UniProtKB/Swiss-Prot annotation:
Protein name according to UniProt: Tyrosine--tRNA ligase
Residues engaged in binding L-tyrosine: Y31, Y155, Q159, D162, Q177
Encoding gene, per UniProt annotation: tyrS
PANTHER family: TYROSINE--TRNA LIGASE, CYTOPLASMIC, TYROSINE-TRNA LIGASE
Subunit and partners: Homodimer.
Reactions catalysed: tRNA(Tyr) + L-tyrosine + ATP = L-tyrosyl-tRNA(Tyr) + AMP + diphosphate + H(+)
Predominant place of localization: cytoplasm
Disulfide bonds: none
Keywords associated with the record: Aminoacyl-tRNA synthetase, ATP-binding, Cytoplasm, Ligase, Nucleotide-binding, Protein biosynthesis
EC supergroup of this enzyme: ligase
Protein EC: 6.1.1.1
Family according to the record: Belongs to the class-I aminoacyl-tRNA synthetase family. TyrS type 4 subfamily.
Gene3D superfamilies: HUPs, Tyrosyl-Transfer RNA Synthetase
Compartment(s) of residence: Cytoplasm
Length: 331
C-alpha cells in the first residue's frame, strides 16, 4: 500500500489520516523542492532519491530544481548560471541513484507563467509578515537576514505557490521544511484548494556532532568535514568517518548512527555485517542495530569499519556523475 511506502524512513506525516485516503486515489501527484547549491551530500543525493525511487511506480513525482529560490537565498553567490549547473548536478545525481521516472522541473519554468504569479499573489494575500517571518528557517535564515534583504520574505510564498501551482497531493521535504508545508496547509483552507499531505524526512547531524544537547547542527555541504559529499573518494570517506563524533552505547545525537538508521539500513539492500573478533553481527533492521549498539555489542570502531565501504558503494553512482562535471566552479 502507498501509505506503507510513505511511512518508511519518515519522521512525520501531516496528516496520517489524509495520507491514508490517498491509497484510494488514482493519479496521486507529489513533489520535492531542492535548492541547487553546489556539491550535494549523502542525505540530499542518496537518501532522498532512493526513498522516492521506491514510490516512482505508484505516484507522479516532480523534482523541482529551485533555481530562483537558491538565487533569493544567495546560494552560489546568487549566480543563476552557477545555480543551474548545480541543479544539473542534482538532477543527474538523483537519476544515477535510481530516481529515473520523476519529472524534473526548474523553478524558472514555473515562474515564466502569469498563472503562477496570479497564484503567488493570492497566496501572499492570505498570509502575514509575522507568519512569513516564522517560516524563514526553511531557508536557514532569520528575521535579521530578511531585514537586510526583503526578497527572503518572498521565498516562503514561492514555496507555497509551488505546491499549489503543481497541484500536488504530497509535499516531500526534510523536517526543516515543516514551516512552509504547514503554511501551505493553512492557506489551502483559506483558498479552498487542495491541501497537500506533508511527508517529512529525517535531517542528518553534522559528522562533528552537536555543540550542545539542545543545539542540532545538521550536515552541511558548506562545511565539507561535516558531511559525506557525493564526490568524496574512498579515502575521504574513511577519513571523515574515522574522525566523526560517535559516542559508544548512544544513538541519539550520534551522526554515524543516524546515517546507519536513515540511509544505510533502509536503502543498502542487503544485511550489514559488523566484523568482531568474538563473532560477526548481522544487522537486519533499525531496531536490532539500535539495541546492539546501545547494549555495547557494537563498538564505535567496529561500526565505522563497516560503514566506510558501504557508504563508498552507495555514493558511487552519483560520484560517477560528479566526475563528469567540472566541480571546481562550486569552490
Amino acid at each position: 500500500m502507498l501509505i506503507d511506502k510513505l511511512m518508511k524512513n519518515t519522521r512525520e506525516i501531516v496528516t496520517l489520516e489524509d495520507a491514508q485516503k490517498l491509497d484510494q486515489k488514482a493519479g496521486v501527484k507529489s513533489y520535492i523542492g531542492i535548492e541547487p547549491s553546489g556539491i550535494p551530500h549523502v542525505a540530499t543525493a542518496v537518501m532522498w532519491p532512493r526513498k522516492l525511487a521506491e514510490l516512482q511506480d505508484d505516484i507522479k513525482i516532480y523534482v523541482l530544481l529551485a533555481d530562483w529560490h537558491a538565487m533569493i537565498n544567495n546560494k552560489l553567490h546568487g549566480d543563476l548560471d552557477l545555480i543551474r549547473k548545480g541543479g544539473e548536478l542534482l538532477k543527474r545525481s538523483f537519476m544515477a541513484e535510481g530516481l529515473t521516472k520523476a519529472e524534473y522541473l526548474w523553478a524558472s519554468q514555473l515562474v515564466s507563467s502569469s498563472n503562477y504569479w496570479e497564484m503567488f499573489i493570492k497566496t501572499a494575500k492570505r498570509s502575514t509578515l509575522k507568519r512569513l517571518t516564522r517560516a524563514l528557517p526553511i531557508m536557514g535564515r532569520t528575521e535579521a537576514d530578511a531585514e537586510k534583504d526583503f526578497s527572503m520574505y518572498i521565498y516562503p510564498i514561492m514555496q507555497v505557490t509551488d505546491i499549489f501551482y503543481l497541484d500536488v497531493d504530497i509535499a516531500f521535504g526534510g523536517m526543516d521544511q515543516r514551516h512552509a508545508h504547514m503554511l501551505a496547509r493553512d492557506i489551502a483552507d483559506k483558498m479552498k484548494v487542495k491541501k497537500a499531505v506533508s511527508v517529512h524526512g529525517y535531517l542528518l547531524s553534522s559528522l562533528k556532532g552537536n555543540t550542545r544537547m539542545d543545539n542540532f547542527v545538521k550536515m552541511s555541504k558548506s562545511d565539507p568535514n561535516s558531511a559525506i559529499l557525493i564526490n568524496d573518494e574512498y579515502k575521504d570517506i574513511e577519513r571523515k568517518v574515522n574522525a566523526a563524533f560517535c559516542p559508544p552505547e548512544k544513538v541519539d545525537g550520534n551522526p554515524l548512527a543516524e546515517i546507519m538508521k536513515y540511509v544505510l539500513i533502509p536503502y543498502y539492500g542487503r544485511d550489514i555485517i559488523i566484523e568482531k573478533p568474538s563473532g560477526n553481527v548481522r544487522i537486519e533492521n533499525v531496531d536490532q542495530f539500535q539495541n546492539d549498539y546501545i547494549s555495547g555489542k557494537i563498538a564505535p570502531t567496529e561500526l565505522k569499519k563497516a560503514m566506510i565501504p558501504i557508504l563508498d558503494e552507495m555514493i558511487e553512482p552519483a560520484r560517477k556523475v560528479a566526475y563528469d562535471m567540472d566541480l571546481s566552479i562550486f569552490s
